[in-house]
UniProtKB/Swiss-Prot annotation:
This is 1-(5-phosphoribosyl)-5-[(5-phosphoribosylamino)methylideneamino] imidazole-4-carboxamide isomerase. Its EC number is 5.3.1.16. The lineage of its organism: Bacteria, Pseudomonadati, Bacteroidota, Bacteroidia, Bacteroidales. Transmembrane segments: none annotated. Its main location: cytoplasm.
Amino acid sequence: MIELIPAIDIIDGKCVRLSQGDYNTQKVYNENPVEVAKEFEAHGIHRLHIVDLDGAVSRHVVNYRVLDQIASRTSLVIDFGGGIKTDEDLVIAFDNGAQMVTLGSVAVKNPGLFKKWLEQYGNEKIILGADVKENKISVNGWKEESQQQLIPFLKDYTKEGVFKVLCTDISRDGMLQGPSVELYQQILKEFPNMHLIASGGVSCIQDIIDLEIAKVPAVVFGKALYEGKITLKDLNRFM
C-alpha cells in the first residue's frame, strides 16, 4: 500500500501553496497549520511533510515554531525541509520535533556536510531531496538550477548509503496536472530498492492509484487536498 504524506508548506507561519515553486503565486489556505495537521491526523493520516518556504529562500530555518507546535500537538511522524544548511539548522529541526529531514540544496552545494549528516544520523532520518526541472536538480527554493543530472546525482548518493529520496517534478508541482509517473518508474528501474517518495502534480485519487500501480512506495501531495480535488475521506481506501 502506498504511503500517503500530506504536505504543509509554510510562509509567515501560515499554510500556503505555490505553483511550480513561484513565490508570487502563493495562496494562503489556513492561518493555522496546527489545525490542518490535526485534521489530517483525525482522518487516520500518520505522516506529514512540512516545508519551510521562508527558510528555503532565507537559507536558514525560519518556521521552527510551527514545526514545534504541530509535533507537540499531534502524533504525526514529520519530515521537515527548507533552509537546513548548517549543523545548527539541523539540530533546530530535530529539537523541534522533526523525526526526519529532507535535504536538497546542501546535497548539491555542500556534499561533504550532507555525507557527514548521513553518517551521523543514519539513512532513516536523512531524506535526499531531488527537485528536478528538465532532468536537472534545482536548489535554494528552486530559484537556482544546478548542472547536476538526476540519475548520476542519485547514483552518487545511493553509493553513500542514501535510502529515502523525495523527488519533486517542479514543472508539475502545484499545477494539478498529474504526477510524472514515467519519471518515477525510470528511477525505480534504476534503483529498485529505493524508498522513493513522489511529489508534484497529484490532482485526484486516480493519480495516487497510478503511482501505487507503478509501485512507488510513497507520495507527497497538498494542493489537491486544499482545493478539494481530493477529500480526506477519499483517502480511506489507502489506509
